[in-house]
Amino acid sequence: KGYEHTYLGPSVYNSVKYTFRYRDQLYAGGVAEKDAGEPFAALHNRYGYDYYSFYLLLQNCGRLKSLAVGNYRLSFGQGLVMSTDYLMGKTIYASSFNNRSTGIKRHSSTDEYNYFRGVATTVALTKRLSVSAFYSHRNMDGVVTDGEITSVYKTGLHRSRKEADKKNLLTSQLTGGNVSYQQNHIRLGITGVYYVFNRPYEPELTGYSKYNIHGNHFYNLGIDYAYRWRRFSFQGETAIGKQGWASLNRLQYSPVQDIQFMLIHRFYSYDYWAMYAHSFGEGSTVQNEQGYYVGLETTPFSHWRFFVSFDLFSFPWKKYRINKPSRGTDGLIQATFTPRTNLSMYLKYRYKQKERDLTGSKGTLTLPIFHHQLRYRLNYSLNDVFSSRTTLDYNHFHSQDRAA
């Protein structure tokens, strides 16, 4: 919303990054950052920057597959229990799902929320069996009222006095592990996490947030599985928490080399909650969602790639701006042309329909909301230093005149 006069610092963004790398075995580095509007070396940032991050990652040293000290990220299975990855959403190509990496990774970005601070390690007990363990102890931003945590603040912005008062008010501890077994075409894994806060977590549980977590001690446990046979691939994960459960299963089939078909089914119960989960879906959390997603990718001609998808989803419980269970659809078609390695372009059309409460009806009337998006993007790289990206976007929102 622009620079506000209530901000405590200058309207300048600044960050410093340092990375040391030795082969593919050792990574070390640090990050310092202040957002625009945050003070530097003053007030609540008397040590200079607003955010500091340090990490050390050792990997692929015999049976020691990875060892992280400092800030790190985690991802296991399909992300129903644990994932701090930066996912690209449903518009990602079908083939990209096979390239998703899991395990322990260094946290080298300026993201002030999606990371852990402590130690994590993965050890290969045998060629087929590996074990991971991790522990994290870190401060978090939030709001505390009468000794209870009422909300967790995720933006990492501390520009005004109100935002600065939320800084580092909470302490979270997390511990857990993963056991993974792989033999030929089969892979099995178990992931468990247990986390606590230094104060009771008691957000306001009303309306659509009625089934969110509350208390002080939380856990999640999930089993992930995968099987490959010739041109078939099946992957999935099923998880439970203090209440509710979630399951995501994906089937891929490639009848010929240039065609891939994918079917994804997810079921996230309205009362399932995993604070560090991040997976495939329409919503931003692994909760209160069911759906079937179908995708088809093909490269019938040289330099051309086509992708078509359709998603039919529903929300069994209330959502933001909809006071009853609802449903929707999401369709996409995209054509990508890559004449050279340094030049590519695509044209994409997307159609989405969801339901919303009619303004002023207090949830008694709902309307379908339609979103049409047309995008053209051109990417060009002259060399390793200079590159350009041009995007043309058209968006149109509308609703029916009568309530549904």
Language model features with spans:
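Solvent-exposed loop segments that connect transmembrane elements
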Residues: 42-44, 93-98, 151, 202-212, ...
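Aromatic- and glycine-enriched pocket-lining scaffold segments that form the walls
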Residues: 113-160, 168-180
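Exposed, low-structure sequence patches enriched in small/polar residues
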Residues: 3-13, 23, 116, 170-203, ...
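Compositionally biased linear targeting/interaction segments
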Residues: 1-40, 47, 51-57, 62, ...
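Extracellular/periplasm-exposed beta-strand and loop segments of Gram-negative cell-envelope proteins
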Residues: 103-111, 146, 161-169, 175-176, ...
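Surface-exposed beta-strand-turn/loop segments characteristic
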Residues: 38-39, 85-86, 91, 141-167, ...
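Outer membrane beta-barrel
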Residues: 45-104, 108-141, 258-275
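Outer-membrane beta-barrel proteins
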Residues: 33-51, 105-112, 165-168, 239-241
